[in-house]
């Protein structure tokens, strides 16, 4: 399978593993990777993956999982290889995958966070700043409402790329590597819908994918969120923040509404936790009935596709994955977008 001399191959693998670990441990190396090396990697890999009309990352992951499972059976039963040799080969393959993942994208987990990159100070929640944020948010959400019944992929791509280019310097995010990034539809959309995932970043080939079942109102913000991951953003909260900033700055009404609508669940979740029942009820009543109806329909739509058993397993695995990559809050990281929005709002008032 691998024709290099084993000792040379093992030396190369060992050297790359050490490089990955050093970059994770030394902040200066992580900065060099995220600011200088990764943009070049993403340019090359996203160009390559863009040559294919399907998600090659999804196919690669599927074939890798299948190979890791099937190879030991084949090697043991047909080739009569000893278990030790079989498992060592499987283990070596997984280590190469580990190295590829981190060198191609995963080392961005070790970069500076949003506050460090932008020098925008973190602002802690207070009853005053949270209430101010929520009042302004609901006002803008209601104003932005427009029925979204179709998906204009060209417009969404053009607007998202244009605004990311505008925000890049001020908000600490890379510019898109290409003017026409090619989004892919997830290969296994029915299964992905069963676990409630709407999009993903394919790290091995720097391609971002969207669930084929996405509804029109969700599509623009999800596109901007997953593109943020392609731009090196690993935090889910930060990706939500950038998607919000990009979409709400668009002149296209459907895209702008999608941006505001994308964080509604996170805002209400924080409000329910921080406000009294009476305050929360008043806040909820301020939201336009059409938006509440849309949110309920969205929830019912995804609930009908969701599998509690499969979804629970995926949630557990993804939570471990995030925590293992310096996202200490795990899946709760998504809702931390509200803290980023409040900090940004307070910073803008002083600048």
Each model region followed by its residue ranges:
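Pan-zinc metallopeptidase signature
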Residues: 291-351
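Membrane-embedded alpha-helical segments of integral membrane proteins
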Residues: 14-74
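Auxiliary, metal-adjacent structural segments of Zn-dependent hydrolase domains
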Residues: 147-208, 212, 216
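Alpha-helical transmembrane signal-anchor/signal-peptide segments
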Residues: 30-35, 106-129
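Post-HExxH zinc-binding segment in Zn-dependent metallohydrolases
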Residues: 130-138, 234-277
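N-terminal membrane topogenic signal
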Residues: 1-11
């Amino acid at each position: 399978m691998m024709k290099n001399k084993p000792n040379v191959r093992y030396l190369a693998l060992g050297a790359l593993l050490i490089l990955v670990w050093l970059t994770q441990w030394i902040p200066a190396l992580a900065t060099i990777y995220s600011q200088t090396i990764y943009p070049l990697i993403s340019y090359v890999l996203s160009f390559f993956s863009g040559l294919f009309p399907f998600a090659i990352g999804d196919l690669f992951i599927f074939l890798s999982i299948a190979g890791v499972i099937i190879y030991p059976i084949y090697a043991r039963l047909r080739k009569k290889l000893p278990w030790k040799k079989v498992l060592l080969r499987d283990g070596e393959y997984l280590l190469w995958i580990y190295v590829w993942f981190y060198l191609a994208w995963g080392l961005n987990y070790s970069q500076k966070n949003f506050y460090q990159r932008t020098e925008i100070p973190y602002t802690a929640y207070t009853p005053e700043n949270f209430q101010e944020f929520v009042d302004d948010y609901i006002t803008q959400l209601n104003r932005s409402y427009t029925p979204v019944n179709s998906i204009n992929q060209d417009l969404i791509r053009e607007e998202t790329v244009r605004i990311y280019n505008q925000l890049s310097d001020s908000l600490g995010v890379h510019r898109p590597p290409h003017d026409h990034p090619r989004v892919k539809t997830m290969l296994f959309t029915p299964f992905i819908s069963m676990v409630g995932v709407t999009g993903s970043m394919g790290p091995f080939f720097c391609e971002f994918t969207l669930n084929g079942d996405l509804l029109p109102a969700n599509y623009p913000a999800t596109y901007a969120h997953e593109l943020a991951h392609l731009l090196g953003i690993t935090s889910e909260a930060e990706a939500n923040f950038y998607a919000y900033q990009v979409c709400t700055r668009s002149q296209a009404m459907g895209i702008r509404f999608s941006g505001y609508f994308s964080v509604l669940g996170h805002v209400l979740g924080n409000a329910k936790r921080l406000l009294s029942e009476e305050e929360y009820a008043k806040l909820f009543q301020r939201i336009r009935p059409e938006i509440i109806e849309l949110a309920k329909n969205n929830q019912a739509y995804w609930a009908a596709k969701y599998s509690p058993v499969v979804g629970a397993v995926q949630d557990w695995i993804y939570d471990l994955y995030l925590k293992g990559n310096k996202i200490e809050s795990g899946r709760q990281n998504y809702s931390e977008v509200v803290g980023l929005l409040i900090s940004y709002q307070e910073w803008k008032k002083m600048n």
